[in-house]
């Protein structure tokens, strides 16, 4: 009976010692949070293991995640997966549908990313257009007009310059035959008669003003169809056209004139662009919106994935995943880290404590046997 009591007593004592030892060991992982000193000597095991090795733990966790979990290869594979493709394409489609449904304008779209488009157009737009035009003038001012125009346009003008004669003569004939032309001829005759006085008065004794005006009108109309007159007009137009082509830009427009044109043009362009920017995109560019919804979403998704894949290595270096994780872990309160680890490994920690009681009890049992027989 005495032997049994000794064995039971040793088992209980061993279990208590083993269990409490493991509980203390687990607590010492986290506590104390700071070192304690007696005089100038630091108390052993202060701070606890995790507070003491916190930076090393953060570094190792960051290294493991970067090298084995969130690797560049793994992210690249995930990025190129069909699921990612569909997700990006779906997001683009949603934004395009919102663009159509909400009747968003270009100005509203840019305002969502904190860009005042109207202000940008009025300041940067004017300056940019004027600067580009003035730079163009400075660079090409000594070149001829023909050399500055596109080759196709020069060829077209060369082929059709003779048609200007027909156009001008037809317009002149229509004008002279009209009531306005008749009235203008009569008005000019009145002025002419008033200026010439008595000499013209003698002419009116033989012909009336109306008959003179009618005769002049008929002759002018006849001249518009006369071959020689048309040849003269053609020659004048051709000569003027050739002179115009061969003129340097600075002879046609000096710097001040060109600068004035540049200012007016920049104001016109920016004002027009500002008005268009207030119109809904779906109204302004319906075909483009249809193209976006139909084909571009898939192409844009592929382009995004392709560019991300190409620059993924650079992006990951810029992000510095390891450093980010280290920094984040080092900012956690030790209380939070303790709660987090206990929450994750709660079952395992309880098992360790239970194992301490069991092993302590087993050791106590053998100690009891030794105490009896020795």
From Swiss-Prot:
List the transmembrane segments.
4-24, 354-374
UniProt keywords (A-Z) are: Cell membrane, Membrane, Transmembrane, Transmembrane helix
Identify the main location: membrane
Bilayer topology: Multi-pass membrane protein
Q: Which GO terms describe its cellular component?
A: plasma membrane
Q: Where in the cell is it found?
A: Cell membrane
Q: Would the keyword Magnesium be found if you checked this record's keyword annotation? A: no
Which Cys pairs are S-S linked? none
Origin: domain of life: Bacteria
Which InterPro entries is this protein grouped with? DUF445, UCP032178
Cross-referenced PANTHER family, in alphabetical order?
UPF0754 MEMBRANE PROTEIN YHEB (PTHR35791:SF1)
What family classification does the UniProt entry report for this protein?
A: Belongs to the UPF0754 family.
Its protein name is UPF0754 membrane protein SAOUHSC_01978
Q: Which organism is it from?
A: Staphylococcus aureus (strain NCTC 8325 / PS 47)
């Amino acid at each position: 009976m005495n032997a049994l009591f000794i064995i039971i007593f040793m088992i209980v004592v061993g279990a208590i010692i083993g269990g409490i030892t493991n509980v203390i060991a687990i607590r010492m992982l986290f506590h104390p949070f700071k070192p304690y000193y007696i005089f100038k000597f630091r108390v052993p095991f202060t701070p606890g293991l995790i507070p003491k090795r916190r930076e090393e733990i953060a570094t190792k966790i960051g290294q493991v995640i970067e090298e084995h979990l969130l690797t560049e290869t793994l992210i690249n594979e995930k990025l190129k997966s069909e699921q990612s493709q569909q997700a990006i394409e779906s997001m683009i489609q949603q934004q395009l549908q919102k663009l159509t449904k909400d009747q968003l304008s270009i100005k509203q779209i840019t305002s969502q990313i904190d860009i005042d488009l109207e202000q940008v157009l009025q300041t940067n737009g004017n300056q940019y257009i004027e600067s580009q035009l003035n730079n163009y003038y400075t660079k090409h001012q000594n070149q001829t007009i023909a050399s500055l125009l596109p080759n196709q346009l020069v060829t077209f003008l060369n082929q059709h310059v003779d048609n200007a004669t027909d156009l001008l003569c037809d317009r002149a004939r229509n004008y002279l035959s009209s009531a306005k032309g008749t009235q203008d001829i009569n008005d000019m005759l009145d002025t002419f008669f008033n200026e010439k006085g008595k000499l013209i008065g003698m002419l009116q004794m033989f012909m009336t003003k109306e008959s003179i005006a009618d005769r002049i009108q008929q002759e002018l109309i006849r001249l518009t169809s006369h071959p020689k007159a048309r040849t003269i007009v053609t020659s004048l137009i051709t000569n003027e056209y050739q002179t115009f082509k061969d003129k340097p830009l600075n002879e046609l427009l000096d710097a001040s004139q060109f600068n004035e044109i540049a200012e007016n043009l920049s104001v016109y362009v920016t004002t027009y662009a500002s008005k268009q920017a207030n119109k809904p995109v779906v109204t302004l560019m319906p075909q483009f919106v249809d193209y976006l919804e139909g084909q571009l979403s898939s192409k844009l998704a592929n382009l995004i994935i392709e560019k991300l894949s190409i620059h993924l290595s650079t992006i990951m270096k810029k992000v510095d995943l390891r450093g980010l994780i280290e920094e984040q872990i080092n900012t956690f309160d030790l209380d939070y880290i303790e709660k987090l680890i206990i929450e994750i490994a709660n079952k395992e920690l309880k098992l360790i404590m239970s194992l301490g009681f069991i092993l302590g009890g087993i050791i106590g049992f053998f100690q009891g046997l030794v105490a009896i027989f020795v």
